[in-house]
Regions:
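Extended, amphipathic alpha-helical coiled-coil scaffold segments used for oligomerization/tethering
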Residues: 2-12, 37-142
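Amphipathic alpha-helical coiled-coil segments
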Residues: 18-21, 25-28, 32, 84-87, ...
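Charged, alpha-helical coiled-coil and adjacent rod-like segments in eukaryotic scaffold subunits
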Residues: 100-202
Length: 202
């Protein structure tokens, strides 16, 4: 098999897997966004609980009401954080897969390029419905960097949550939904789908 055909075969297999992984990550992101909204609500309740004086009438008659409310809220918060971390772990798994896809694709490319089975001209040539090999390899690199960066940002946000500074914790959490969309490479993905459909019909 010539280098060009081998690379296209590898990239077709990888891109098919990439589509599935993007859906998996997008589902986790969507689910986590709902959890973040609930978490923000609980933090607001906890902040309000900390501000209220429970030593005056009529709240003074309820014993350790503040302590019991705080315990209930923090327990709910910790439970949500566990679920959010589970979603983040799913996204991290996807990021790891993308790193594997990029490495294995470049391995195939370098293997054939080093043996002279794939020229630079072949690697940079695109067809009517087929992106160039170079473009697809670059896209895989961008995808890997995008999801690695996304994981770092989400991890940083969760690490910034503290009960000692509830306003700052809320501020950090609001960044969760405003992070750059990892699917900003939609145009490239659309082109890849055309490529995959053409390969399937070939």
């Amino acid at each position: 098999m010539d280098g060009y055909t081998a690379c296209l075969r590898k990239l077709r297999k990888v891109c098919t897997s990439v589509e599935k992984q993007i859906v998996k990550a997008d589902d986790a992101l969507t689910h986590s966004n709902g959890l973040i909204s609930s978490l923000l609500n609980l933090l607001e309740q906890l902040a309000a609980c900390e501000k209220v004086s429970f030593d005056t009438e009529p709240l003074a008659h309820f014993g350790d009401l503040q302590g019991r409310l705080r315990f209930k809220l923090t327990s709910a918060i910790e439970s949500l954080l566990v679920k959010i971390h589970e979603d983040l772990n799913t996204i991290k798994e996807v990021a790891s897969r993308f790193a594997e896809f990029r490495r294995s694709s470049f391995d195939v490319y370098n293997q054939h390029a080093s043996k002279g089975n794939l020229s630079v001209a072949e690697a940079i040539t695109a067809g009517p419905v087929c992106p160039s090999i170079a473009s697809m390899l670059e896209w895989l690199q961008q995808l890997e960097r995008m999801y690695a960066g996304l994981c770092e940002e989400k991890t940083e946000i969760l690490e910034g949550i503290t009960y000692n500074d509830l306003p700052q914790s809320q501020k950090e959490l609001r960044r969760w939904k405003t992070q750059r969309n990892p699917l900003h490479l939609t145009a490239a993905m659309d082109q890849i789908r055309v490529f995959l459909a053409d390969q399937k019909d070939a």
